Protein backbone atom coordinates (compact mmCIF):
# COMPACT_ATOMS: atom_id res chain seq x y z
CA UNK A 1 0.00 0.00 0.00
CA UNK A 2 1.28 3.44 -0.96
CA UNK A 3 0.56 6.77 0.67
CA UNK A 4 0.67 9.83 -1.58
CA UNK A 5 0.43 13.40 -0.30
CA UNK A 6 0.68 15.29 -3.60
CA UNK A 7 -1.43 15.33 -6.74
CA UNK A 8 1.69 14.71 -8.83
CA UNK A 9 2.63 11.69 -6.75
CA UNK A 10 -0.85 10.20 -6.94
CA UNK A 11 -1.00 10.70 -10.70
CA UNK A 12 2.33 8.91 -11.10
CA UNK A 13 1.13 6.01 -8.94
CA UNK A 14 -2.10 5.64 -10.93
CA UNK A 15 -0.67 6.02 -14.44
CA UNK A 16 0.26 2.31 -14.80
CA UNK A 17 -3.29 1.30 -13.84
CA UNK A 18 -4.73 3.74 -16.35
CA UNK A 19 -2.50 2.60 -19.20
CA UNK A 20 -3.49 -1.02 -18.59
CA UNK A 21 -7.17 0.00 -18.37
CA UNK A 22 -7.64 -1.30 -14.85
CA UNK A 23 -10.80 -0.30 -13.00
CA UNK A 24 -10.03 2.34 -10.38
CA UNK A 25 -12.30 2.53 -7.34
CA UNK A 26 -12.36 5.55 -5.06
CA UNK A 27 -13.51 6.05 -1.46
CA UNK A 28 -13.34 9.69 -0.26
CA UNK A 29 -13.12 10.12 3.53
CA UNK A 30 -12.11 12.65 6.16
CA UNK A 31 -10.23 10.00 8.12
CA UNK A 32 -10.89 8.88 11.70
CA UNK A 33 -12.06 5.68 10.06
CA UNK A 34 -14.57 3.16 11.40
CA UNK A 35 -16.13 -0.05 10.08
CA UNK A 36 -18.54 1.93 7.90
CA UNK A 37 -15.62 3.37 5.95
CA UNK A 38 -13.92 -0.02 5.81
CA UNK A 39 -17.11 -1.54 4.38
CA UNK A 40 -16.86 0.96 1.52
CA UNK A 41 -13.31 -0.21 0.85
CA UNK A 42 -14.36 -3.87 1.00
CA UNK A 43 -17.12 -3.18 -1.53
CA UNK A 44 -14.65 -1.35 -3.76
CA UNK A 45 -12.24 -4.30 -3.58
CA UNK A 46 -14.97 -6.60 -4.89
CA UNK A 47 -15.64 -4.48 -7.97
CA UNK A 48 -12.36 -2.74 -8.81
CA UNK A 49 -8.74 -3.59 -9.62
CA UNK A 50 -7.20 -0.64 -7.75
CA UNK A 51 -8.72 1.09 -4.70
CA UNK A 52 -7.78 4.64 -3.71
CA UNK A 53 -8.91 6.10 -0.37
CA UNK A 54 -8.55 9.82 0.24
CA UNK A 55 -8.10 11.17 3.76
CA UNK A 56 -8.70 14.91 3.80
CA UNK A 57 -10.48 17.03 6.39
CA UNK A 58 -12.11 19.52 4.05
CA UNK A 59 -12.26 22.97 5.67
CA UNK A 60 -14.82 24.45 3.28
CA UNK A 61 -17.61 22.06 4.25
CA UNK A 62 -17.48 23.07 7.91
CA UNK A 63 -19.66 25.98 8.99
CA UNK A 64 -19.03 28.58 11.64
CA UNK A 65 -18.94 27.00 15.09
CA UNK A 66 -18.54 23.47 13.71
CA UNK A 67 -15.74 21.10 14.64
CA UNK A 68 -13.09 21.57 11.91
CA UNK A 69 -10.25 22.36 14.30
CA UNK A 70 -11.16 19.53 16.66
CA UNK A 71 -11.99 16.91 14.02
CA UNK A 72 -9.75 13.90 14.80
CA UNK A 73 -6.71 13.44 12.56
CA UNK A 74 -5.65 9.79 12.90
CA UNK A 75 -3.64 9.05 9.76
CA UNK A 76 -1.33 6.43 11.28
CA UNK A 77 -4.23 4.46 12.77
CA UNK A 78 -6.25 4.85 9.57
CA UNK A 79 -3.33 3.57 7.49
CA UNK A 80 -3.15 0.34 9.50
CA UNK A 81 -6.90 -0.21 9.11
CA UNK A 82 -6.77 0.42 5.37
CA UNK A 83 -3.81 -1.91 4.89
CA UNK A 84 -5.76 -4.67 6.63
CA UNK A 85 -8.68 -4.39 4.16
CA UNK A 86 -6.51 -4.22 1.05
CA UNK A 87 -6.48 -0.55 0.12
CA UNK A 88 -3.91 0.07 -2.62
CA UNK A 89 -3.26 3.82 -2.34
CA UNK A 90 -4.00 6.42 0.34
CA UNK A 91 -4.20 10.00 -0.89
CA UNK A 92 -3.64 12.31 2.09
CA UNK A 93 -3.11 15.85 0.76
CA UNK A 94 -2.66 19.03 2.77
CA UNK A 95 -5.14 21.89 2.56
CA UNK A 96 -2.57 23.84 0.54
CA UNK A 97 -2.16 20.92 -1.88
CA UNK A 98 -5.92 20.87 -2.49
CA UNK A 99 -6.69 24.59 -2.51
CA UNK A 100 -3.37 26.41 -2.94
CA UNK A 101 -2.35 29.46 -0.95
CA UNK A 102 -5.25 31.61 -2.09
CA UNK A 103 -9.00 31.41 -1.36
CA UNK A 104 -10.92 29.37 -3.88
CA UNK A 105 -12.64 31.36 -6.60
CA UNK A 106 -14.86 28.62 -8.04
CA UNK A 107 -18.03 27.47 -6.32
CA UNK A 108 -20.20 24.48 -7.19
CA UNK A 109 -23.78 24.44 -5.98
CA UNK A 110 -26.26 21.62 -6.56
CA UNK A 111 -29.62 23.36 -6.40
CA UNK A 112 -32.96 22.20 -4.99
CA UNK A 113 -31.95 19.04 -3.10
CA UNK A 114 -29.55 21.02 -0.88
CA UNK A 115 -32.16 23.57 0.20
CA UNK A 116 -33.58 21.70 3.20
CA UNK A 117 -32.77 18.83 5.58
CA UNK A 118 -29.08 19.25 6.47
CA UNK A 119 -28.72 22.03 3.92
CA UNK A 120 -31.07 24.26 5.88
CA UNK A 121 -29.22 24.00 9.18
CA UNK A 122 -25.73 23.85 7.64
CA UNK A 123 -25.69 26.60 4.97
CA UNK A 124 -22.84 26.22 2.49
CA UNK A 125 -22.02 22.70 3.65
CA UNK A 126 -23.03 20.94 0.45
CA UNK A 127 -21.32 23.56 -1.72
CA UNK A 128 -18.11 22.69 0.12
CA UNK A 129 -18.77 18.98 -0.39
CA UNK A 130 -19.48 19.51 -4.10
CA UNK A 131 -16.24 21.44 -4.62
CA UNK A 132 -13.97 18.97 -2.84
CA UNK A 133 -15.59 15.89 -4.38
CA UNK A 134 -15.34 17.39 -7.88
CA UNK A 135 -11.67 18.21 -7.28
CA UNK A 136 -10.99 14.71 -5.95
CA UNK A 137 -12.82 13.13 -8.90
CA UNK A 138 -10.66 15.17 -11.30
CA UNK A 139 -7.47 14.25 -9.42
CA UNK A 140 -8.15 10.52 -8.98
CA UNK A 141 -10.20 10.02 -12.18
CA UNK A 142 -11.89 6.88 -10.84
CA UNK A 143 -14.22 4.61 -12.75
CA UNK A 144 -16.33 3.97 -9.65
CA UNK A 145 -16.78 5.88 -6.37
CA UNK A 146 -18.32 4.57 -3.16
CA UNK A 147 -20.35 6.51 -0.58
CA UNK A 148 -22.24 5.45 2.53
CA UNK A 149 -26.02 5.75 2.67
CA UNK A 150 -25.91 7.22 6.18
CA UNK A 151 -25.15 10.56 4.52
CA UNK A 152 -28.14 10.02 2.24
CA UNK A 153 -28.53 13.66 1.21
CA UNK A 154 -24.82 13.89 0.40
CA UNK A 155 -25.10 10.75 -1.74
CA UNK A 156 -28.02 12.32 -3.64
CA UNK A 157 -26.00 15.51 -4.15
CA UNK A 158 -23.05 13.53 -5.54
CA UNK A 159 -25.30 11.56 -7.90
CA UNK A 160 -26.85 14.80 -9.19
CA UNK A 161 -23.43 16.41 -9.56
CA UNK A 162 -22.08 13.50 -11.60
CA UNK A 163 -25.18 13.46 -13.80
CA UNK A 164 -25.28 17.22 -14.40
CA UNK A 165 -21.56 17.56 -15.14
CA UNK A 166 -21.42 14.39 -17.28
CA UNK A 167 -18.65 12.89 -15.18
CA UNK A 168 -17.82 9.34 -16.37
CA UNK A 169 -18.02 7.83 -12.88
CA UNK A 170 -20.38 5.21 -11.47
CA UNK A 171 -21.62 6.13 -7.98
CA UNK A 172 -22.41 3.26 -5.63
CA UNK A 173 -24.24 3.76 -2.34
CA UNK A 174 -23.34 1.27 0.39
CA UNK A 175 -25.84 0.42 3.20
CA UNK A 176 -25.44 2.00 6.63
CA UNK A 177 -23.06 0.21 8.99
CA UNK A 178 -24.46 -0.04 12.52
CA UNK A 179 -23.17 -0.92 15.95
CA UNK A 180 -24.64 -3.90 17.83
CA UNK A 181 -27.40 -1.67 19.28
CA UNK A 182 -28.36 -0.08 15.97
CA UNK A 183 -26.49 3.21 16.26
CA UNK A 184 -25.26 4.28 12.82
CA UNK A 185 -21.46 4.30 12.79
CA UNK A 186 -20.02 7.79 12.57
CA UNK A 187 -16.68 9.42 13.29
CA UNK A 188 -18.56 11.85 15.52
CA UNK A 189 -19.83 9.07 17.82
CA UNK A 190 -16.51 9.44 19.61
CA UNK A 191 -17.69 12.82 20.91
CA UNK A 192 -20.49 11.18 22.92
CA UNK A 193 -20.12 10.78 26.66
CA UNK A 194 -20.72 7.33 28.14
CA UNK A 195 -24.23 8.34 29.21
CA UNK A 196 -25.02 9.88 25.81
CA UNK A 197 -23.77 6.75 24.06
CA UNK A 198 -26.42 4.75 25.95
CA UNK A 199 -29.14 7.12 24.71
CA UNK A 200 -27.95 7.48 21.11
CA UNK A 201 -29.47 4.21 19.76
CA UNK A 202 -32.91 5.71 20.45
CA UNK A 203 -32.68 7.31 17.00
CA UNK A 204 -32.60 3.98 15.17
CA UNK A 205 -35.10 2.38 17.54
CA UNK A 206 -37.50 5.26 16.92
CA UNK A 207 -37.02 5.02 13.16
CA UNK A 208 -37.84 1.29 13.26
CA UNK A 209 -40.96 1.99 15.33
CA UNK A 210 -41.99 4.64 12.80
CA UNK A 211 -41.55 2.10 10.00
CA UNK A 212 -43.76 -0.36 11.89
CA UNK A 213 -46.45 2.29 12.39
CA UNK A 214 -46.45 3.16 8.69
CA UNK A 215 -46.94 -0.51 7.81
CA UNK A 216 -49.87 -0.54 10.25
CA UNK A 217 -51.49 2.33 8.36
CA UNK A 218 -50.81 5.19 10.79
CA UNK A 219 -50.87 8.57 9.01
CA UNK A 220 -47.42 9.86 8.08
CA UNK A 221 -47.87 13.19 9.85
CA UNK A 222 -48.74 11.38 13.10
CA UNK A 223 -45.78 9.03 12.72
CA UNK A 224 -43.39 11.96 12.30
CA UNK A 225 -44.89 13.79 15.26
CA UNK A 226 -44.42 10.77 17.52
CA UNK A 227 -40.90 10.20 16.21
CA UNK A 228 -39.96 13.76 17.15
CA UNK A 229 -41.66 13.42 20.54
CA UNK A 230 -39.79 10.21 21.38
CA UNK A 231 -36.43 11.77 20.53
CA UNK A 232 -37.15 14.93 22.50
CA UNK A 233 -38.28 12.88 25.49
CA UNK A 234 -35.02 10.90 25.34
CA UNK A 235 -32.98 14.10 25.60
CA UNK A 236 -32.26 15.00 21.98
CA UNK A 237 -32.57 18.49 20.56
CA UNK A 238 -34.20 17.70 17.23
CA UNK A 239 -33.03 19.56 14.14
CA UNK A 240 -35.47 17.83 11.81
CA UNK A 241 -37.62 14.75 11.40
CA UNK A 242 -38.75 14.39 7.79
CA UNK A 243 -39.94 11.98 5.12
CA UNK A 244 -39.01 12.22 1.46
CA UNK A 245 -39.18 10.24 -1.74
CA UNK A 246 -35.92 8.36 -2.48
CA UNK A 247 -34.95 11.23 -4.83
CA UNK A 248 -35.48 13.68 -1.90
CA UNK A 249 -38.59 15.21 -3.43
CA UNK A 250 -41.60 15.80 -1.13
CA UNK A 251 -43.89 12.84 -0.47
CA UNK A 252 -46.86 12.58 -2.82
CA UNK A 253 -50.15 11.07 -1.69
CA UNK A 254 -49.65 7.60 -3.14
CA UNK A 255 -45.89 7.14 -2.73
CA UNK A 256 -45.08 3.66 -1.40
CA UNK A 257 -41.30 4.10 -1.24
CA UNK A 258 -40.03 6.73 1.16
CA UNK A 259 -37.08 7.60 3.36
CA UNK A 260 -37.34 8.76 6.96
CA UNK A 261 -34.68 11.25 8.06
CA UNK A 262 -33.52 12.37 11.50
CA UNK A 263 -30.95 14.95 12.54
CA UNK A 264 -30.64 15.72 16.24
CA UNK A 265 -28.13 16.89 18.80
CA UNK A 266 -27.30 14.89 21.88
CA UNK A 267 -25.24 17.13 24.11
CA UNK A 268 -22.78 18.78 21.73
CA UNK A 269 -22.85 15.98 19.17
CA UNK A 270 -24.98 16.20 16.03
CA UNK A 271 -26.18 12.79 14.84
CA UNK A 272 -27.97 11.89 11.62
CA UNK A 273 -29.67 8.71 10.48
CA UNK A 274 -32.21 7.53 7.94
CA UNK A 275 -34.34 4.52 7.14
CA UNK A 276 -35.69 3.46 3.75
CA UNK A 277 -39.27 2.22 3.96
CA UNK A 278 -41.19 0.22 1.34
CA UNK A 279 -44.92 0.13 1.97
CA UNK A 280 -47.22 -2.48 0.50
CA UNK A 281 -49.42 -1.34 -2.35
Swiss-Prot record:
Its EC number is 6.3.2.1. Keywords: ATP-binding, Cytoplasm, Ligase, Nucleotide-binding, Pantothenate biosynthesis. It holds the Pfam family Pantoate_ligase. Beta-alanine binds at residue 61. GO terms for molecular function: ATP binding; pantoate-beta-alanine ligase activity. The keyword Cytoplasm applies. ATP binds at residues 30-37, 148-151, 177, 185-188. It is an enzyme of class 6 (ligase). (R)-pantoate binds at residues 61, 154. This is Pantothenate synthetase. Its main location: cytoplasm. The keyword Cytoplasm applies. Gene3D superfamilies: HUPs, Pantoate-beta-alanine ligase, C-terminal domain. HAMAP family: PanC. Pathway: Cofactor biosynthesis; (R)-pantothenate biosynthesis; (R)-pantothenate from (R)-pantoate and beta-alanine: step 1/1. The active site is at 37 (proton donor). Homodimer. InterPro entries: Cyt_trans-like, Pantoate_ligase, Pantoate_ligase_C, Rossmann-like_a/b/a_fold. It is found in: Cytoplasm. The gene is panC. The reaction proceeds by a bi uni uni bi ping pong mechanism. Catalyzes the condensation of pantoate with beta-alanine in an ATP-dependent reaction via a pantoyl-adenylate intermediate. Belongs to the pantothenate synthetase family. One of its GO terms (biological process) is pantothenate biosynthetic process. One of its GO terms (cellular component) is cytosol. It catalyses: (R)-pantoate + beta-alanine + ATP = (R)-pantothenate + AMP + diphosphate + H(+).
